[in-house]
Amino acid sequence: KHFHTTCACPRFSKEKCEENAFVVDRLEEAGAILIGKTNLDQFATGLVGTRTPYGICSSVFNREYMSGGSSSGSSVSVAQGYVSFALGTDTAGSGRVPAMCNHIIGYKPTRGLLSARGVVAACRSLDCVSIFSETIRDAQLVGSIVCQFDAKDNYSRSFQIRSCPWIETSTFRFGIANEETLLFFNDQLN
């Protein structure tokens, strides 16, 4: 309700929201300060971050690279360090793709774990609020605040957040792809 929800469509720029999304209210109740809304692929229908009349969000690594989308502005704002976390949506990759392109965490929870009430729907049965952050710990913290049952969201369900022992690790591990895997994905990776 603090800002217009345009879905990157100029025609919606005069529409005032009557209420916040459920998850935004939970964050504000916990002390989060709403900075603003970010750009996206229009109506959340793109995975590149370039389908918008409001200007393209470029990758934080190179202005010539795409940021990924559709929640491009949210991912770039976290990757640039403007905010410690941001919300987006994820129906078919709109949270995970821009997170990958900008080297941050993009958490898509199981459908119904976070209320989608107040989110402009692309596909109501698949839409999820996604969380962008620089660290898994921050994503877990935001998730623990917004993961609440919402009786007004038909998909919402009660769920108890479990501890995440994989966040606390004393050893560093990494994998090396074998020759067959490298060949499958790209000859230039060899």
Question: Which residue stretches match the model-derived regions?
Answer:
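Short Gly/Pro-enriched turn/cap motifs at secondary-structure boundaries
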Residues: 14-16, 64-68, 96, 120-122, ...
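Conserved active-site and cofactor/substrate-binding residues in soluble primary-metabolism enzymes
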Residues: 18, 22, 72, 89, ...
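Short, hinge-like loop/turn segments at secondary-structure boundaries
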Residues: 52-55, 102-106
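A short helix-breaking turn/cap at a secondary-structure junction
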Residues: 105-189
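Short acidic, glycine/serine/threonine-rich loops at helix termini
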Residues: 3-5, 45-49, 96-101, 118-119, ...
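Alpha-helix boundary/capping residues
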Residues: 30-31, 50, 101, 111, ...
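Acidic, glycine-rich active-site loops and adjacent beta-strand->loop/helix elements
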Residues: 40-42, 89-95, 99-101, 180
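Gly/Ser-rich catalytic/binding loops embedded in alpha/beta enzyme cores
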Residues: 1-91
